[in-house]
């Protein structure tokens, strides 16, 4: 899995109040299992004890002791990419294809359903690669740790695995040696999909230019075919050894247990000095005589205005991540400059309409070796590019001169306080993600964990010098040169890339002898034979269904009426109150549905009649952890046709600020200025750009939803609210003039607002026992304020026109396809739901993964069954062989009926399902299954027992009943499609 820090911001570390574990205390200088203790540190603000150790081989280990049963482990290596062949990325894939101890094909995917881990993955970052997992089961921890260590340190690295995961030449039809020879490979196709994403293309080209010493770790599809098998093995030998390793553990399992396992592996490894694996630094442009300027070409987005597809950014060096305090200060500056409606750059760049949204690299990036602050815009016209640059510089100069409002600084610090108090069930993973990037680049991991001392120093500096932040800004942003990066849209970009790929293929084919072609055909046959061979998986460790408890404890909930229905979850919350409200939108005419996402976004974007959104946002940040509005459609657990369209409000605040939170909700709900057409147009442009980018990142999700929308009223509404239908709707709105928005859109939003305020609400509150009485009074007052409003519509039942199921292709300028197929299932309480859920998992792991990914070359593919929506789905992700995939899925039901399923197959599917079912959740999520979805404890317990009791005969029966002879079958795909598509069977939408 490719992981890009700047496109996927790391999870903000948040804290659940635990005591530190009672593990034996280690002292500096102690030696345990070959590891010397370098440093230890208590971090009382996070209730943890951190220990940094070093093995005799040079490997470092960071252990975070905390009384948390959700233990985390990771092994990682510094992997500076030597070129753009994607060797770190391909190696990440290939190491997981078998090891000395576990000589089976793809033990990583095999362990996905032999474990109860709530997280398992492998990720390639810009300059390091890591393999993390999390589990609450001690035996599971031991099993997975051994598999991960053996996979990374002792992989088989077979040439056929390299061909499958990296790239290869192969006959298009692997059974016909006369068929054309083409380029294939999982990573090759994954990166073709990535490069089709305009946001990714901008970011990666920017990164290559500002970090010329740091190549594209994911790989450029036009360069990937230059990587050799020998090059892969050498990169592993040079980089995947203990002297270059950093391991991490977190939780209540003893550090000695981890160190003993690591020592046993490290002692049997050859130690080699890793060449050229030092910290990589960006261009030293800050002291150059002139600002550095780079212009590149990139893909266009056909869903956006073709005249507004320029992207640009300006970047400044802002010190080293090794200076923890300085880095904290520049993070504060970055947030104050760009985050939210009250930030000066948001007002000048986005509110002004100069662009649709920030450029993909906007923000502070502290990896790999420098703090780089970037700000820019996308959705810019060519004529405005120079103006954008001038506006950015002038805004920074003005801010340095005038400073930031103290209320904004206080609001930002208040958000950090709330983040620390918020109870997160995946704190260990968040901690790991926060520490690793710096640790791999010589940032002290123990210093990086400190919080109170950094915050205390910042408060003292601000008190001593109110212009402290202005001086830091002047030092880095005014007194230094910047790096200017620009990407111009080229309508022929995808065509040119394809032509270059064709040239690479033609050049390779021209050098082939008849003997080479015969060898290519034989290699393809051997690869397919390897993929088909049954395996003995007895060497792999596994948990058992007996390790899954048949019952889960009931969460203590209270239900009261005051006279409004409230669900209470009374538990320790670190002084926070979590508030939820749901009201039915039944009776809203269906022609208003596409406007609902705009309505909810407007509430936190447009501002009110008396206050700008910037002013309101400052109040929200200073008094709450955020206010959120959303709409969703859900099915009844008892009957799929029974559905509910809901408007929801969610908020969190310190107990002392709950009344203020309700006041802010009132302000937004009653007084939002929907006539603010300039802000509305800006919001539509930003929403369109964001959803368009999501298509290229998660196209399979959009395809699955679109397919389901043809056979389910609930999914039809979901597609209108957040699927392809919403993308197309927003694209149409983005092309409208301000006057058209005034005439056609604003009245709809005003009517929805009036309607939403008439609906009866039900509430859920999670808080401490001592706050129940006070919160009960506040909720009652809040609810009473809505009673006098009348609906502008005649109330009717929820209904929406349906279309005939079909096969739909949304033709998009991608290099690969995304596909979704939907088949009706049953309601949550139906007895067949459990075997359908098990069947989907078995099909994915025992058939579709092999057929779609290993053979077909797609990055991913499988089946899923959503128990609450009652839909069976097939999907593929970044798929070069759409036609083959659709045929495979169509035949999957028959394959399931004929398959001789084993008891092991059944057990593995159940283990895999319960990874998610039994994953730890935060206190704020407890009771939400009942509140949001209407699922009672008794219904969920019955479903649990049904899943555990599913037999092979049940799986075969539902496969025949629902998949072989489905009552409905709908297909949707996003991408270029395939050459032999029957236009009579497909509806093609541009």
From Swiss-Prot:
Q: Establish whether keyword Transit peptide is in the entry.
A: yes
Residues of the transit peptide: 1-25
What is one GO cellular-component annotation here? Answer: mitochondrial intermembrane space
Any keyword Repressor? no
The record's annotation in InterPro entries points to: Metalloenz_LuxS/M16, Pept_M16_N, Peptidase_M16_C, Peptidase_M16C_assoc, PreP_C
Cofactor annotation remark: Binds 1 zinc ion per subunit.
Could you list this entry's UniProt keywords, alphabetically sorted: Hydrolase, Metal-binding, Metalloprotease, Mitochondrion, Protease, Transit peptide, Zinc
Q: Which cofactor names does the annotation list?
A: Zn(2+)
Q: Where does Zn(2+) bind?
A: 89, 93, 190
Output this protein's name. Answer: Presequence protease, mitochondrial
Origin species, per record, is Yarrowia lipolytica (strain CLIB 122 / E 150)
